[in-house]
Amino acid sequence: MKKHNYSAGPSILPQEVFEKASKAVLNFNDSGLSILEISHRSKDFVAVMDEARSLALELLGLQGKGYQALFLQGGASTAFLMAPYNLMKENGKAAYLDSGTWATAAIKEAKLFGETVIVGSSKDDNYTYIPKGYEIPADADYFHCTSNNTIFGTQIQEFPSTNIPVVCDMSSDIFSRELDFSKFDLIYAGAQKNMGPAGTTLVVVKEEILGKNGRTIPSMLDYAKHIKAESMYNTPSVFAVYVSLLTLQWIKAKGGIAAVEKLNNAKADLLYAEIDRNPLFKGAANVEDRSKMNVTFLLNNPEHTETFDALWKAAGISGLPGHRSVGGYRASIYNAMPIESVQVLVDVMKALESKV
């Protein structure tokens, strides 16, 4: 039986993507070769990379607007240092919003390159809310934020307006909701939350912001070099890029980001409504900052933990325990999560009510 996968990542992908990818593992494009063994320079894979890069920009509404899409390696953790390496001037500074664990990790890397101003932080309340009302220094080389926080279940609902370049880590909510993506100058997202398997990272960057900070950048960390090499400066993660393309095609076939967002809202509303209705549970995040991707919640009485755990496991649910730094539970309801699976969890929460 296929389980209801609530893992925060690597995470659920569409069933049809699994099916197409599994066929490609045996015979890709009737080539007689597996996708795992084809040359990354072959015309078949070059076509995959080109379409993936183009489709990413199309879905984000950024085609013809001076942006380039790249599929790189190293995850968002490498992007944490690539941003300052490519954008922070010598003796410059950057502004960061500290809204969670991954924002903190990005800040740590930025401090290696220059002054790093933390414009706002929710660390004082274990990151249960998104900081607001902060000021971004006009003389900063860029502003960095994390759109969604997988661990704490918070999500930025309104992004600040500023005249300096805006960098955003969208690893866990990329392609999940409509935004004016032209307000961002650099977006990066590890594939393993909402787009594909671990092994590749989508980078979307406005070309005009590159090459201005005067630094000598190592080749593998230089966005401009990756653009010039058409995302093939070194051997890319062929399979991860291919599966990401299949997922992007699935999003387009669904009706694009607008259609996906509508379903995501319905799933989140269904689950949060039960959390708020059921006296046995409480949400972990500030209500106005609740994530539509990672729903964090707690039992009001820890004595019910054993019973609840037995119920959701018996229902075929996987990956529900919360991160160790928060505890409780975390239901990751990414794009590919069907609303039927969310209903299963809601039914389990109601069943607990009748048992205690």
Curated annotation (Swiss-Prot):
Molecular function GO terms recorded: O-phospho-L-serine:2-oxoglutarate aminotransferase activity; pyridoxal phosphate binding
Reactions catalysed: O-phospho-L-serine + 2-oxoglutarate = 3-phosphooxypyruvate + L-glutamate; 4-(phosphooxy)-L-threonine + 2-oxoglutarate = (R)-3-hydroxy-2-oxo-4-phosphooxybutanoate + L-glutamate
Keywords: Amino-acid biosynthesis, Aminotransferase, Cytoplasm, Pyridoxal phosphate, Pyridoxine biosynthesis, Serine biosynthesis, Transferase
Binding locations of pyridoxal 5'-phosphate: 76-77, 102, 150, 169, 192, 234-235
Described function: Catalyzes the reversible conversion of 3-phosphohydroxypyruvate to phosphoserine and of 3-hydroxy-2-oxo-4-phosphonooxybutanoate to phosphohydroxythreonine.
Pathway(s) where this gene product acts: Amino-acid biosynthesis; L-serine biosynthesis; L-serine from 3-phospho-D-glycerate: step 2/3; Cofactor biosynthesis; pyridoxine 5'-phosphate biosynthesis; pyridoxine 5'-phosphate from D-erythrose 4-phosphate: step 3/5
Cofactor(s) named in the record: pyridoxal 5'-phosphate
Origin superkingdom: Bacteria
Protein name listed in UniProt: Phosphoserine aminotransferase
PANTHER family assigned: PHOSPHOSERINE AMINOTRANSFERASE
Any one GO cellular component localisation term in the record: cytoplasm
Pfam families linked to this entry: Aminotran_5
Cofactor note: Binds 1 pyridoxal phosphate per subunit.
Entry's EC annotation: 2.6.1.52
Record's subcellular location: Cytoplasm
InterPro entries linked: Aminotrans_V_dom, Aminotrans_V_PyrdxlP_BS, Pser_aminoTfrase, PyrdxlP-dep_Trfase, PyrdxlP-dep_Trfase_major, PyrdxlP-dep_Trfase_small
GO-annotated biological processes: L-serine biosynthetic process; pyridoxine biosynthetic process
Family from the record: Belongs to the class-V pyridoxal-phosphate-dependent aminotransferase family. SerC subfamily.
